[in-house]
Amino acid sequence: MAAAGARLSPGPGSGLRGRPRLCFHPGPPPLLPLLLLFLLLLPPPPLLAGATAAASREPDSPCRLKTVTVSTLPALRESDIGWSGARAGAGAGTGAGAAAAAASPGSPGSAGTAAESRLLLFVRNELPGRIAVQDDLDNTELPFFTLEMSGTAADISLVHWRQQWLENGTLYFHVSMSSSGQLAQATAPTLQEPSEIVEEQMHILHISVMGGLIALLLLLLVFTVALYAQRRWQKRRRIPQKSASTEATHEIHYIPSVLLGPQARESFRSSRLQTHNSVIGVPIRETPILDDYDCEEDEEPPRRANHVSREDEFGSQVTHTLDSLGHPGEEKVDFEKKAAAEATQETVESLMQKFKESFRANTPIEIGQLQPPLRSTSAGKRKRRSKSRGGISFGRAKGTSGSEADDETQLTFYTEQYRSRRRSKGLLKSPVNKTALTLIAVSSCILAMVCGSQMSCPLTVKVTLHVPEHFIADGSSFVVSEGSYLDISDWLNPAKLSLYYQINATSPWVRDLCGQRTTDACEQLCDPETGECSCHEGYAPDPVHRHLCVRSDWGQSEGPWPYTTLERGYDLVTGEQAPEKILRSTFSLGQGLWLPVSKSFVVPPVELSINPLASCKTDVLVTEDPADVREEAMLSTYFETINDLLSSFGPVRDCSRNNGGCTRNFKCVSDRQVDSSGCVCPEELKPMKDGSGCYDHSKGIDCSDGFNGGCEQLCLQQTLPLPYDATSSTIFMFCGCVEEYKLAPDGKSCLMLSDVCEGPKCLKPDSKFNDTLFGEMLHGYNNRTQHVNQGQVFQMTFRENNFIKDFPQLADGLLVIPLPVEEQCRGVLSEPLPDLQLLTGDIRYDEAMGYPMVQQWRVRSNLYRVKLSTITLAAGFTNVLKILTKESSREELLSFIQHYGSHYIAEALYGSELTCIIHFPSKKVQQQLWLQYQKETTELGSKKELKSMPFITYLSGLLTAQMLSDDQLISGVEIRCEEKGRCPSTCHLCRRPGKEQLSPTPVLLEINRVVPLYTLIQDNGTKEAFKSALMSSYWCSGKGDVIDDWCRCDLSAFDANGLPNCSPLLQPVLRLSPTVEPSSTVVSLEWVDVQPAIGTKVSDYILQHKKVDEYTDTDLYTGEFLSFADDLLSGLGTSCVAAGRSHGEVPEVSIYSVIFKCLEPDGLYKFTLYAVDTRGRHSELSTVTLRTACPLVDDNKAEEIADKIYNLYNGYTSGKEQQMAYNTLMEVSASMLFRVQHHYNSHYEKFGDFVWRSEDELGPRKAHLILRRLERVSSHCSSLLRSAYIQSRVETVPYLFCRSEEVRPAGMVWYSILKDTKITCEEKMVSMARNTYGESKGR
């Protein structure tokens, strides 16, 4: 096999390119040694330092970096495969592409596709260093390997690579050490403690020597600076000109591929590979890496010739390239580059053309005849890289040696030997003499040599494979050494492969299960033993892509994206954001999107503009070139929906003839749609399981479900026209029977005609659901709607003798237990409670009477406890369960739930019940009637019927007989009763004349235990799908999926504002606090938290309150808005408003409350409440309109003032007395004035009423000023102020004052969950002053 050519990469990472010389010339500029001294004092990088010191060290000691590029052309040619996409001009700019183009004419299948060129690879690197794959080549370019070797020259010279085409169609590439290196590795001693001690001592010695040298150089530097400060520059001096060029170093390039004639190739193969043994039985080509050379002058050609012949002993084709070290600002070098670039293309094309002609004619070519330009640049077209080639010149090699040189054409590229220099004409006198400069230079060289000897140069080989996309086939293998890895960061389209690692060349291979996951690499964690992926805490595997991780714990970060943070300005001095917004976002709510598997629904802003209010304060101007806008509009196409994008590809079917190829009752649709082949079902129909037609799943069965539609014998199909669309039809499927059989009443099973009995003597067929005793136990139950479904879950059989007293035979599987006698016929009267339904909306509250009250009276009898002992699934339910699979859609499962329910009843209470609700108009009326009932039943003890009479019977008697009391208390009482079942005649508490029944049929009263229907499903996958659909129907309205404790809505479940609404935000019900009745200045409100356990998350409640008077425009006056979370719980509210939170009867239910303590008496107030969720939605409003209690009145003081006014008015009233009476009446409040008038008229009306006397004594003007204040008293308060007695009292009511423990950051949008807010509550006593109104004292 011909040895593949190689080249040294001239990239910037190479340590050979641009290596500075350390060969000094007489009279150097004085600043160069000083600069070199500072560079040497700094710790240099290992590779750069090693290359810098290469001139003054031994050839085998410095660190080297070499890059070799190996073409795969010879191996691919031997495989006799066609390289797809190669054409004559494909490789005009790349050597690999040209070679592929030259090889393609003689290869079969050159017009194949890229997929046909996939190859199996087996890459093995026994040396430390990673393997990288980059699919950065075009399909017309030839794949190649790049070896980047770092280490000493002795180690690099032992590196070998082998490339071979295996018989099984695999391209094998192996990088290893030579036999001596392998032997050294295999026989290395296991215990190296003495050598390590010696190395440590030598290391300490070297550090000491280096420290002394550094101190010496520092002293020389200080001495030089002192001399420089004492000297002065000569008066006549010139500024030196910059050097036009410098001495350049040598670097070696390997040709990517050299095309040889057949005789030379055969002679080379026979002479080179006879002494080598193949590992697998096929000749393996083997190319050693050349050593580097030392620093040498260009004026010594014989030394160069000797070096070249030393390299040629390995039988390789080499090239010496001269690359100058240019300085910034050299105009001549730039000019040379520009001039050389013009002649580059012609020379490269002519060279490649002669290569192709030589290959076709099988004759060698004399490359030395070509006259290339001084420099050339070749840029290979790559997807992600573009490398410039160094300038070269071509000629015949001189002084070659070796047996191979006589048998084949030897191609050697080398650079020119001389470069012109431009000397400086200016002379600058240096203050440092030559002796000091020489000392500094020698010390620098010694220091560099010592530093270089201390550097560790381990041997590493990085193998990079450059291939076209989809070149590597699945099943390829890679082997790396322990500690190395496979780099696929630049592999855009990786293949499935096997990855192994080994400790050394003789150790067994260990499979790296995690590293070989190229197509589905684990995002976070990977188990090295199994290769399975896992996630960090707070993350969970993606449901679809198990190797990816999604957030499972979002903490406080859920909610809309905080775009408002971006809208505000930022002060660099203070480091804070300004409260005013500089920018304004324009949102398009229809383009909202979910963050991937998260709780956040994001509405991105479609435009960002300057806020009009801030435009006057800022100097920001946003402009855009109209030409750019037009060009962008011309070059881009916008599609509103995905269907618009699909429709741009044209029709999917031709529906003009033969229904577009759609079968049966499918309709042909020419428009392209997502997941549609063009054949769709008519509306309200769905395809059959086998896809042969469309049917109505709510009315028929599916004969193609795999279970014969649940039919016992025949499943028949019939095509019927749709009633709402005459052009469409549906396939109706039903069960049938063969001859001598008849369809059973269940519609699916068949009965023999001989066994069918008809007539009055035959057994009655299965009765209907409503006529079956305890039939609810055999049917499904919807736990959300609290209703029993018609779908029968369990089979109703009467094979066992299941009897109970006073009832016919019961169905099998039912266990009926009668309750004890002491629990039968018991009347229960609840405690009187405020009527919550009357504490919301427009409230008519009378502080003299109190809250409206309600009581409940309940009597239960004929009670039975019913349980399911054994269950047998019904045939229809079993057939439906067989149809359901884990792939069943949510719509199918929801249809099942709608028909059969979500649970079945396992235990329930049956019997009869009488429930009566007693509504009292006020708390005062309820208390008086209760006292009256107790008094009469106690005093009339001789009448047994009254003594044992229930309270409900006593009230009913009062309402029936119209035995009204003096104060008409019973007039506002209302009794509403509801009866379930029939009351037995044995219960005197509920029986009614004419409606007694000895053994009434018990009805369902209470469900004690339910079991989900998915427990009846055996398959775990189907069970999980059913559970998911059940959760969706319960919490997400069947339009979304439940994830943790929230709903991810479908794309169709969005409201008009573009926000998800599958989990509706319920309306909170604002009401007066039942435990704290309003006073003249204090009102307490409360509401139940509407946040469900799963679904919508409430972020805040907004409470608005305003005073509504006759003279107030309610539309213009909006009142005051308070945020429950930000204003009340955070403590920002005033002392007049406080927040609280308590729990209801169930601990999971939270009740929020707000107390207002500074309201005006006798004022009409309107309170409004709405909820805000974490996505910015607002619930519907809930309002409470209430007039506060009348102002407090001191009745004793009012009576004293009335007596004082009478005394002033009595007899002759002087001017002083008139003024005193006027001042006294004007100082009191309007309510006190009204009460003074009441007392004056009650006591002294016979001497003239208050109005007439005031006008007579004070005059019309002053009397009008006083009496006009009485108009401010409302009609409600005026009626109460006319009461005979008014007593003042102070009540002390406990109240929970709560405050948030969390401090919210200022200037940030806060979207937290209110229920999760940590608050601390403290119980305090609230004093409330009230007036008690009555006709007599003490009542």
Swiss-Prot record:
Changing A229V: Found in a clear cell renal carcinoma case; somatic mutation. The C-terminal region after the fibronectin type-III domain presents structural similarity to annexin domains and binds calcium ions. SUPFAM superfamilies: Fibronectin type III (SSF49265). Glycans are attached at N168, N770, N783, N1020. Changing D298H: Found in a patient with global developmental delay; uncertain significance. It is a multi-pass membrane protein. Residues 296-316, 363-408 are annotated as: Disordered. Residues 1065-1188 form the Fibronectin type-III domain. Keywords: Calcium, Cytoplasm, Cytoplasmic vesicle, Disulfide bond, EGF-like domain, Endosome, Glycoprotein, Membrane, Metal-binding, Protein transport, Repeat, Signal, Transmembrane, Transmembrane helix, Transport. Residues 510-550, 651-695, 699-751 form the EGF-like domain. SMART domains: MACPF. Belongs to the astrotactin family. Interacts with ASTN1; the interaction is not calcium-dependent. The gene is ASTN2. One of its GO terms (molecular function) is calcium ion binding. Residues 1-49 form the signal peptide. Disulfide bonds join C514-C526, C522-C533, C535-C549, C655-C668, C662-C679, C681-C694, C703-C715, C711-C735, C737-C750, C825-C987, C916-C977, C983-C990, C1036-C1047, C1049-C1062, C1136-C1158, C1190-C1277, C1298-C1321. GO terms for biological process: establishment of body hair planar orientation; negative regulation of protein localization to cell surface; neuron cell-cell adhesion; neuron migration; protein localization to cell surface; protein transport. InterPro entries: Annexin-like, ASTN1_2_Fn3, ASTN_1_2_N, ASTN_2_hairpin, Astrotactin, FN3_sf, MACPF. This is Astrotactin-2. The chain crosses the membrane at residues 207-227, 435-455. GO terms for cellular component: cell cortex; cell pole; clathrin-coated vesicle; early endosome; endosome; late endosome; membrane; perikaryon. Residues 50-206, 456-1339 are lumenal. Mediates recycling of the neuronal cell adhesion molecule ASTN1 to the anterior pole of the cell membrane in migrating neurons. Promotes ASTN1 internalization and intracellular transport of endocytosed ASTN1. Selectively binds inositol-4,5-bisphosphate, inositol-3,4,5-trisphosphate and inositol-1,3,4,5-tetrakisphosphate, suggesting it is recruited to membranes that contain lipids with a phosphoinositide headgroup. It is found in: Membrane; Perikaryon; Cytoplasm, Cell cortex; Early endosome. The keyword Nucleus does not apply.
